[in-house]
């Protein structure tokens, strides 16, 4: 019973702390969000269908409240645990209780607990067992008496204290540990190091860095307070690979002098020098290394959090790229000797045909001669309108080949380069084997390349998000944290768009709010066994899809051309009565959803009356109206599509000052990589993204953006292109 009370108290205190911390939200919003989450509602459901209650908070804001509450509840529980552990030792005082109450970080809590923690056997504990604690206390009194004479009284052969020196050394160990355990000294020295410390790196084994990736860190330093996150991760990686040694250096003369002044009451005492030595020893062996570890951990955690956030933002923009609807697409997985694999998909993603051609060096002359004709025949046979070329090995040679062939086709067929990051991971996965059991791995890749252009979201959810190529130092961040963030991003993106329940794969459905891997598979099995769903109510018959899961999921599951037109919208069934009443009031029951006539009919409605009649807020009313007026809405259609090309651009043709259009492929701390149609993506450094100060590249560009760039530097030998998004006319203005 006691445990339950404690848990409730910790939860309640954590809620109060969230309100005090996250002042950008009203207390009522925080209570509402946490209440809805406790009732088993999902983040996407709350964000879309409970806007009236939350004040239109989005998924990111809801998750921020959820995560902060969870962290603070664990923090409060740790506080209670420390209080209990100290109390069990009979050492809990009002001062300690007050200090615990004031603590706002885990570091502060652990500093308070440190003196009471069960220690492993140290030199200080051995010295205490040898009876030297009274001697240590005497030394701290800094009397005028002789240290040697006092030390002699503690010689004890049985306890291995054989000399005066042994006694003094033992007492120094005890004093050093006491000082190390003082929370206030650790706090002072930690803050001093954070403010004045310098992160330094020196080369350790240069031969391990063959490509000179870490050359700038061979002799490098940067203040702790201003070091940027991506350099922290680069240093960590260089250190992990044994290329450099990293330390934090700081001159602690001033703070140690203050400790000395506080501890040494009588500087002329014979014991003063010994106490001073103990203070230095305490810092050198205990406090200093611990603070260095803590600060490096803090810097790493901060850098990892940012790297995860950037990865999440890049992934979101990648998933929400515009789909290429209504196109017959030929996917081409490039290769030299083994041939380019081709796969054609129709407007729905169904595979129409596949083939292999050998247009490149490595294949026989005869095969190369046949490749062009084979390619053109396939394009004509299936009515291909768009070619998707993977950006891997032989990509640019394949682009040249495709451009040459398309010039010989009388009608307009265009191509684009598609990132094939993760295509090989997908091709060898269980999902791919289930979809295409009789295909070779490379043939599956060609299908994936075509489909990820046609519907990026539906295809990319089949791949581990870590494999899609938009991360930064993703192997240097905690996997659990990264997975949680990426799962959240995928879930948010899928629910933002919604899915057609009659065509969606289980891999896509499992990200719908309220569904799991099992229930998603059950939806597909039910569909296969019983035919297409004709209304949303049928979803209730799916095994293991209970009332709560149905409530959470149904609004995100669309049934196109079903028996109820509302089922093709994102209006939730709980609001169908509102939708029917709106149409009745406007005498528009027979008008098609999304039609100009319906839009006209709804213009004159008194929305205030509707809200009062149904007891709903403005947000729910707007959601219903949007569903009636834009039934097939897809937020991705507002995003610019990929750059479609009909001719190739060679690296050699680039010139400094040349203006180009490109696609942002990756955003990192120091800039953005842009595909301009040559072999290597060009880098737009953060300083070249726009005029003026840029806090982070993601404030200016996002993955998938189409941008205008100018070539600022070329290195054909290294295949490097530097770009700028600041036009020549704005350079000096």
Predicted regions and their residues:
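Long, charge-rich intrinsically disordered scaffolds of nucleic-acid metabolism proteins
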Residues: 108, 416, 422, 427-497, ...
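Duplex nucleic acid-engaging cores and interfaces of nucleic-acid transaction enzymes
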Residues: 2, 58-64, 71-331, 335-439, ...
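Generic start-of-chain signal for non-secretory N-termini
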Residues: 1-31, 38
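A glycine-rich phosphate-binding loop feature that marks nucleotide/adenosyl-phosphate handling sites
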Residues: 191-198, 332-336, 393-397, 418-425, ...
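Low-complexity, acidic/Ser/Thr- and charged residue-rich accessory regions of DNA metabolism proteins
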Residues: 153-164, 220-221, 256-264, 269, ...
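Long, charged amphipathic helices and adjacent flexible linkers at domain junctions
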Residues: 294-312, 467-498, 611-656
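Accessory alpha-helical DNA-binding modules that contact the DNA backbone or grooves
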Residues: 42, 54, 58-158, 496-638, ...
